[in-house]
Amino acid sequence: MRNHQLGIYEKALAKDLSWPERLVLAKSCGFDFVEMSVDETDERLSRLDWSAAQRTSLVAAMIETGVGIPSMCLSAHRRFPFGSRDEAVRERAREIMSKAIRLARDLGIRTIQLAGYDVYYEDHDEGTRQRFAEGLAWAVEQAAASQVMLAVEIMDTAFMNSISKWKKWDEMLASPWFTVYPDVGNLSAWGNDVPAELKLGIDRIAAIHLKDTQPVTGQSPGQFRDVPFGEGCVDFVGIFKTLHKLNYRGSFLIEMWTEKAKEPVLEIIQARRWIEARMQEAGFIC
């Protein structure tokens, strides 16, 4: 058994798998858990309306396989953001949040990862920020009532691209049910002092996403997806050394989007082995 649970993102696995098949495959590839995606597509949004029988079936599959789903990546708020100028969109954002909390409670999901966007497809201004703040405060209250953790991901846009920026929201909301979910790729791409950022948030980190990225520069917008491990700007050995010094005890999630790749299984096994090698190099025993 690992000292630190290592999971794989659902979108790294073939899309046409059933949930029992997905869990078995993750286990056979050496992973401890799968992170569920509820994104902005109608297909994945429909999970929020699963029947009791569908929910029970997935819980049974987790028990039978020994592979859990401790976290949900709720990126549906890109399409339906709390900060939208459209009241109907904001109402839909709240409905999605309520249903996601209920699904998490039923499935035993402990952490819902929120995207740190006030808006995504609309222009940002002080109004979108204020409406996002109101929606987020409401969401944290709902999650607290169900004992479900909300953790904001450090993002690929400037709005929430550091733990330092997240910390201001933490101070405002002041809830034990509101934490941070750092993505070391995003943290690195924006030129942050990554060790200092991790130290700043260490007591509030719910889990950590592992991916590589290309940096944002004056000549480049960066690349936040599909960068092979070892070909980007992330200093994984340095990060694992920092986390070892900080006595980080949480889990890690390898974030990949290989569900349409020719050999997704081979790619995720290679990614796991590469990450484990960097951990070993850093003296961080996974």
UniProtKB/Swiss-Prot annotation:
Root EC class: isomerase
Entry EC no(s): 5.1.3.22
Pfam family, one: AP_endonuc_2
GO terms of biological process kind: DNA repair; L-ascorbic acid metabolic process; L-lyxose metabolic process
Top-level taxon of origin: Bacteria
Key word Isomerase present: yes
Biological function: Catalyzes the isomerization of L-xylulose-5-phosphate to L-ribulose-5-phosphate (Potential). May be involved in the utilization of 2,3-diketo-L-gulonate.
Family: Belongs to the L-ribulose-5-phosphate 3-epimerase family.
Protein name: Putative L-ribulose-5-phosphate 3-epimerase SgbU
